[in-house]
UniProtKB/Swiss-Prot annotation:
The keyword Iron applies. It comes from Escherichia coli (strain K12). Heme-based oxygen sensor protein displaying phosphodiesterase (PDE) activity toward c-di-GMP in response to oxygen availability. Involved in the modulation of intracellular c-di-GMP levels, in association with DosC which catalyzes the biosynthesis of c-di-GMP (diguanylate cyclase activity). Cyclic-di-GMP is a second messenger which controls cell surface-associated traits in bacteria. Has very poor PDE activity on cAMP but is not active with cGMP, bis(p-nitrophenyl) phosphate or p-nitrophenyl phosphate. This is Oxygen sensor protein DosP. The gene is dosP. Homodimer; has been previously suggested to be a homotetramer based on size exclusion chromatography. Forms a complex with DosC. One of its GO terms (biological process) is response to oxygen levels. Its cofactor is heme; Mg(2+). The EAL domain (residues 532 to 799) is a cyclic dinucleotide di-GMP (c-di-GMP) PDE hydrolyzing c-di-GMP to 5'pGpG; it has no activity on cAMP. Binding of an external ligand to the heme located in the N-terminal sensory domain displaces the distal heme ligand from Met-87 to the ligand and triggers a conformational change that regulates the activity of the C-terminal catalytic domain. Changing residue 107 to T: Increases auto-oxidation. Residues 402-532 form the GGDEF domain. Heme binds at residues 69, 87. InterPro entries: Biofilm_reg_signaling, Diguanyl_cyclase/Pdiesterase, EAL_dom, EAL_sf, GGDEF_dom, Nucleotide_cyclase, PAC, PAS. It catalyses: 3',3'-c-di-GMP + H2O = 5'-phosphoguanylyl(3'->5')guanosine + H(+).
Length: 799
């Protein structure tokens, strides 16, 4: 056939449809000659149309297939199908330059005008075949992975699994294919949540993971961490999901071991019981094991706890680990015996490692508990029992129907040592007094330090003559002066004695305290029995004390707020929060009455804690109303300062309500400045470090020296109302106030005069440069809800 005839034939039969086809199109006649060769075919083979048309098709067949090709064509012409399978056949096409590319092709047999033609449609499949080869290699690689892997179709059916999956779960691909993992691996009797979470993971459209308890083909239950990774095509259509598995059974056991032990620690069981809990949990993880714990005391191992199993284990292998404190010092020994082959060595080592850390925590917890117990029950300076210990001791005696005699001992004149030599030497003086007490202490007597310079002796000798003899012996303890830094300091004791059959602890301590106060008010250096007159007063206090306890627990106390004004500008300096109590039975009870009572019955710290929290809450509420209060001051008892929880209580309240330290001022009395307790001053310094101001209330009523004022981190001093009342009539008082304001200015302290009621008092105080004024002249103490109205209608005051 000539070239023009071929062109005409192609043009008439195939050209309109195939010339622009993106697939290579090749048409051959009954003589196997190429009649049509479109541009796409030119691109695939690298031949020009003119080179191919009219030539035998063999020139387009790869050399290695040419020998068999004529027979294939002949066979097909004689009875082959009209259409060979679509585009599903791959063939390596050999180009003009000898290079080869992968293609997909379909061959169609066409009969026309009694002649048989063949049309081949071919497209480049290089990328597909490369991907197919990559997939094949990937499948081989995945099959050799140590981690189990399955491949899912978009309907979450398993289409592929590797050998590691088969080894872990027991299912080969023929058994797993077409199954959904939540059906194949779920434990029927396990809570539904397990399967629901597995289903949720399977239907994730992004990477995710979770942990499940799954079932193997053999019925074994194993903890698994499963991860899912969706695979998308270029059009963001989901093609497959790859799911990987990790056996975390041992990891879960170790986490459970750690969690169980930590949970037990939170309940603070006794030390030996905690050890048994650790042993039992180790035993539950390690099959056929025996566990022992030893604590080191002075370097020697002391048995702490053991598991319940007997120590005799067949073919036992032993593991031993040193339990160490945080600083690395040895604190104990952990011993584990397991049956040979019961567990892998690596797993036992992991269990031993985490267990020794848990045991170390338990030992530290016990050490901390003992330390806290020591702090709670004993005075850190003297080593004597403290107030808490005393309360427990007296309660125990009363419960046993024993009537003790209580001697409340106040050491007089310690202040002389402080003023002369300082606090450190005063500590030494008190320790010397304690040592002398101990030398005289009898086996059945109990001695404790309840605060500062006050001690309590409890004796079971209740004969009157014996009581007075003991009191005299106590006084004789300090008959000789205490030698401090080669200087003699004469000290005396004021002793209050209480004894009454069937009375409780509060009664005994209150009455002894009243008796001691009576001695001190009369010059000290003596002892005093509690009198009937005192008894009536105590009864009244006990009734009122019960009411006060109820008021505190029922939140019946209230705070009122008295403004403080700058004397020169009339602007607000701050507000003082004052506690008030109105009892349904006793009516209005003044602070001068219920505050000392709260101190006696041990409720003063609860009041102080409430005052701090309520003041901070109210300050935050005003702030939310855009009411600016520069500072709020609160009064705290000296006893509250003896609590090591005070700084934390203040910090917690400030943090809870978002209060800055400079917005809060804590007031202490001048008499508390004279207290000899270094712990108190440490707590004061902590408060100042938090930014909290420190005000000395009732300044001038005590006997504190300037050295004390300088040594404390004071920011403010308050002139007592008793001086303000007399400043207009007594020149000496006025001179004292002038001196106080001058001292305040020199030390950069704010001086506040409280109790100012008249214009004359105000003018006089402003004249001597008292910076801040507080009192009824400006405002009475107001409920919180009245403060905003007062500020908007009065401030700034016209001075």
């Amino acid at each position: 056939m000539k070239l023009t005839d071929a062109d005409n034939a192609a043009d008439g039969i195939f050209f309109p449809a195939l010339e622009q086809n993106m697939m290579g199109a090749v048409l051959i006649n009954e003589n196997d000659e190429v009649m049509f060769f479109n541009p796409a075919a030119e691109k695939l083979w690298g031949y020009k149309r003119e080179e191919v048309i009219g030539n035998n098709i063999d020139m387009l067949i790869p050399r290695d297939l040419r020998p068999a090709h004529p027979e294939y064509i002949r066979h097909n012409r004689e009875g082959g199908k009209a259409r060979v399978e679509g585009m599903s056949r791959e063939l390596q096409l050999e180009k003009k330059d000898g290079s080869k590319i992968w293609t997909r092709f379909a061959l169609s047999k066409v009969s026309a005008e009694g002649k048989v033609y063949y049309l081949a449609l071919v497209r480049d499949a290089s990328v597909e075949m490369a991907q197919k080869e990559q997939t094949r290699q990937l499948i081989i690689a995945v099959d050799h992975l140590d981690r189990p892997v399955i491949v899912l179709d978009p309907e979450r059916h398993i289409v592929q699994c590797n050998r590691a999956f088969t080894e872990m779960f027991g299912y080969c691909i023929s058994e797993a294919s077409g199954m959904q993992p939540d059906t194949l691996l779920n434990i029927p009797e396990f809570p539904a949540d397990n399967r629901i979470r597995l289903q949720q993971l399977l239907w994730k459209t992004a990477r995710d993971q979770d942990e499940f308890l799954l079932l193997t083909r053999t019925g074994e239950k194993i903890w698994i961490k499963a991860s899912i990774s969706p695979v998308y095509d270029v059009l963001a259509h989901l093609q497959n999901l790859v799911m990987t598995f990790s056996d975390i059974t041992e990891e879960r056991q170790i986490r459970q071991l750690e969690g169980n032990i930590l949970a037990a620690m939170c309940s603070s069981p006794p030390f030996h019981e905690m050890g048994e809990i650790i042993c039992r949990n180790i035993e539950s993880v390690l099959n056929e094991s025996h566990v022992s714990l030893f604590a080191l005391r002075n370097g020697m191992p002391i048995h702490w706890a053991s598991s319940s199993h007997g120590a005799e284990i067949q073919n036992a292998q032993s593991w031993s680990a040193t339990i160490r404190q945080r600083d690395g010092a040895p604190a104990g020994i952990l011993q584990i015996k397991t049956s040979s082959g019961a567990e892998t060595s690596a797993f036992i080592e992991r269990v031993a490692d985490i267990s020794q850390h848990m045991a170390a925590l338990a030992l530290e917890q016990e050490k901390s508990r003992q330390h806290i117990e020591q702090l709670i029950q004993f005075d850190p300076m003297t080593g004597l029992p403290n107030r808490n210990n005393l309360h427990n001791y007296l309660d125990d005696l009363v419960d046993k129907a024993v009537s003790p005699v209580v001697y409340l001992i106040g050491v007089d004149h310690i202040q002389d040592v402080i003023d002369s030599l300082g606090y450190a030497w005063a500590d030494q003086a008190l320790l010397e007094v304690v040592n002398r007490f101990r030398e005289k202490l009898k086996p059945d007597q109990y001695l404790c330090r309840i605060e500062g310079t006050q001690f309590v002796l409890v004796s079971l000798e209740n004969d009157v003559s014996n009581i007075t003899q003991i009191a005299d012996e106590l006084r004789n303890v300090v008959s000789k002066p205490i030698m401090i830094d080669d200087k003699p300091f004469p000290l005396t004791l004021s002793i209050g004695i209480s004894y009454d059959l069937g009375k409780n602890r509060d009664y005994l301590l209150s009455t002894a305290h009243n008796a001691m106060d009576y001695i001190r008010k009369n010059g000290g250096n003596g002892w005093q029995f509690f009198s009937p007159a005192m008894n009536e007063m105590v009864k009244e206090r006990l009734v009122l004390g019960a009411a006060l306890k109820e008021a505190i627990s029922n939140n019946q106390l209230k705070l009122v707020y008295q403004p403080q004004i700058f004397a020169e500008t009339g602007e607000l300096y701050g507000i003082e929060a004052l506690a008030r109590w109105h009892d349904p039975l006793h009516g209005h009870v003044p602070p001068s009455r219920f505050i000392p009572l709260a101190e006696e019955i041990g409720e003063i710290e609860n009041i102080g804690r409430w005052v701090i929290a309520e003041a901070c809450r109210q300050l935050a509420e005003w702030r939310s109303q855009n009411i600016h209060i520069p500072a709020l001051s609160v009064n705290l008892s000296a006893l509250h300062f003896r609590s090591n929880q005070l700084p934390n209580q203040v910090s917690d309240a400030m943090h809870a309500w978002g209060i800055d330290g400079h917005q809060l001022t804590v007031e202490i009395t001048e008499s508390m400045m004279m207290e000899h307790d270094t712990e108190i001053f440490k707590r004061i310094q902590i408060l100042r470090d938090m930014g909290v101001g420190l005000s000395v209330d009732d300044f001038g009523t005590g006997f504190s020296g300037l050295s004390r004022l300088v040594s404390l981190p004071v920011t403010e001093i308050k002139i007592d109302k008793s001086f303000v009342d007399r400043c207009l009539t007594e020149k000496r008082i006025l001179a004292l106030l002038e001196a106080i304001t001058s001292i305040g200015q020199s030390l950069n302290l704010t001086v506040v005069a409280e109790g100012v009621e008249t214009k004359e008092q105000f003018e006089m105080l402003r004249k001597i440069h008292c910076r801040v004024i507080q009192g009824y002249f400006f405002s009475r103490p107001l409920p919180a809800e009245e403060i905003p109205g007062w500020m908007s209608s009065v401030l700034p005051l016209k001075i």
